[in-house]
Amino acid sequence: MLVTRPLLSPEWVARLKQFKKLIVGFSGGLDSTVLLHVLASTPPLSNQLLAVHINHGISGNSLNWQRHCEQLCLDLGIAFIAKAIEFDRSANVEEAARNARYDFFSSLLEDNDCLVLGHHLDDQAETVLLQLFRGAGVDGLAAMQECSNLGAGQLARPFLTCPRVELEHYARIHELKWIEDESNQDTKYSRNYLRHRVMPLLLEKWPGVAGNISRAATHCQQAKANLEVLAIKDCPDLLNATDHLLIEPIKGLEFERITNVLKFWLKKNRIQLPSSKTFHRIIHEIIFAKLDAMPTVSWNQIQVRRFQQHLYLLKADQINLPKAIKWQQFPASLTYPDADIKLSAVKAQKGLMIPKDAQIEIRFRKGGEEIYWHGQTKHLKKLFQEWQIPPWVRDRVPLVYINDQLACVVGYAVSDLFFTTNPLEAWSIVNNS
């Protein structure tokens, strides 16, 4: 006879009650159906719920599944939205679909919101094994956490210590109906192969193996937390660092501790960790490079560079070089969606003067630019050097041209020819990237 416990403990109810809105990832499968029913049956939480169904468009049954989910939410009196998502299907479909899901969930979360997912103990065990087979370190083997940050809100997995069999028992008792996705039987997908071919053999030999593997993940989570504390102790600059990091404090550390600091820095910037080989390259080719060297290490549209005594992290939208564009709707904001640049114009006490009917264009450095500044004609290249702007950033600094004359280097200088102290005429151009 199956000994059951409440799927949602009083501690979890108290924890979830503090949020303004609980967004439930609702696929219609067993896990999310039980999760939604449990939450809807818990009075302190039932009025906080929003069920979100992601339609991946992979199966021919997708629309039927969406209708099923919508009807169940209608029966339970729960707000429901569905979203069809697009993602790259040319490579790892599982990973691409997952990333697209989480991106959409993240976009929904506001301050004091929580995304609640139905992952259970068996899912955790599978995740640990998949990470192990990939040669993951402590971060990967820590697998899924019960609580973590996501976007502006939080992510919670209240069933992570519950075996799937307990969810099945709950579903039978409450006569719940759920979707069986036919793709879950396809063993060409790694997780399905593990679930249907490997786990049954392990469970036959060691019946409690899923719980033991999950417990190992908890140990790895504690080790991960300890390593993060050590990283901050080794490099206090991590507390303030965003896309740049001071090199000097870490040069005297052992190799493994430098790697630990770099991992913390990349995770803080939401960058997927590279291979051990890449960490070796960052340390040997960049951190210990000659002072005047400017090496680069790249992976997956990410770059780590060095300029003087700092490491710099560049993401894909910071690597793409923007093209010139006319600012026809000035002073409305101007956005470069693929280059992480958004310009806005705000009134100022002194600053840039825009003549009436002027032609305004945003350009970027190509070489040879000059600006009349502080009573002299100066080469932009020399000014960038004086301002100690990293070389790769120089090509991305917006240049405001008015009637084909360089009038403003955004964030740094306004040409004397276009400078005014008249508050009625003065503008400040701000790069909000």
From Swiss-Prot:
Q: Where in the cell is it found?
A: Cytoplasm
What is this protein identified as? Answer: tRNA(Ile)-lysidine synthase
Quote the gene name from the UniProt entry.
tilS
Q: Which is an annotated Pfam family here? A: TilS
Q: Please name the Gene3D superfamilies in this protein's record.
A: 1.20.59.20, HUPs
Record flagged with keyword Ligase: yes
Give the species.
Answer: Legionella pneumophila subsp. pneumophila (strain Philadelphia 1 / ATCC 33152 / DSM 7513)
Describe the function of this protein.
Ligates lysine onto the cytidine present at position 34 of the AUA codon-specific tRNA(Ile) that contains the anticodon CAU, in an ATP-dependent manner. Cytidine is converted to lysidine, thus changing the amino acid specificity of the tRNA from methionine to isoleucine.
Which family does the UniProt entry place this protein in? Belongs to the tRNA(Ile)-lysidine synthase family.
